[in-house]
Each structure stands twice: as structure tokens, then as C-alpha cells.
């Protein structure tokens, strides 16, 4: 059996969690992602920057009243990368054990 390579950008736990949230929600605000992942604000910011630099997500900075609001949205490139990652992961899980 040939295993498909796993995207190292998505293989990191926090980045995978962010992408999983965005796959099901399409977009989410920073505090929601932070709450759902249990990440620190600093670490989450770094990981979001990496996903954004790769073109997997778009980051929009706006204001809600006078407060800053960061919104993350998955891109079509990010959706395709996530789907490819899931398919590659399945190649590792689809192992038949013979006795």
C-alpha cells in the first residue's frame, strides 16, 4: 500500500483544528476560534498567519463598534487542501490486518 503524503501545514494540531472549524462554519471570529480550540491568543495568531500566508484562509480585520474584530474565512484553496488532507489520512487508516 502506498501512503499519500500529509500536508505538513495542516498536520499541526492547532492549524488542523482551525481548519476543521472553518470547514463547518466557513468563517468565524477570532474569540470563537480561540474558545473552541483552547489556544492562547498569541499562538492562535501565529497559526492563523501561517494558514493565511498559504492562502488557506482569508483574514479580515474590522471593528464592532469601537472594538477590533478579526474574522477568518476558509478559501477554496483551503477547502481543497483540507479535503486532500482527509483523503490522504484515510490512506493511513484503511490498512487491512491479516493474520
Where are these regions (language model features)?
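Short beta-strand "wing" residues that participate in macromolecule-binding interfaces
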Residues: 59
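Amphipathic alpha-helical dimerization/coiled-coil segments
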Residues: 1-3, 20, 79-99
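Basic amphipathic alpha-helical segments that dock to polyanions
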Residues: 48-51
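Accessory beta->alpha helical hairpin/"wing" motif in late/C-terminal subdomains of nucleic-acid enzymes
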Residues: 74-78
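Glycine-centered, phosphate/nucleic-acid-interacting loop/turn motifs that mediate DNA/RNA or nucleotide
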Residues: 55
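N-terminal helix-turn-helix DNA-binding core of bacterial DNA-binding proteins
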Residues: 2-40, 62-64, 71-73
Amino acid at each position: 500500500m502506498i501512503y499519500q503524503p500529509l500536508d505538513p501545514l495542516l498536520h499541526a494540531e492547532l492549524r488542523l483544528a482551525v481548519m476543521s472549524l472553518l470547514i463547518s462554519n466557513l468563517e468565524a471570529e477570532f474569540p470563537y476560534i480561540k474558545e473552541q480550540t483552547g489556544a492562547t491568543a498569541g499562538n492562535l495568531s501565529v497559526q492563523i498567519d501561517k494558514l493565511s500566508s498559504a492562502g488557506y484562509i482569508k483574514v479580515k480585520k474590522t471593528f464592532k463598534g469601537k472594538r477590533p474584530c478579526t474574522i477568518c474565512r476558509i478559501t477554496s484553496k483551503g477547502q481543497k487542501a483540507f479535503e486532500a488532507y482527509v483523503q490522504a489520512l484515510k490512506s493511513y487508516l484503511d490498512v487491512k490486518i491479516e493474520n
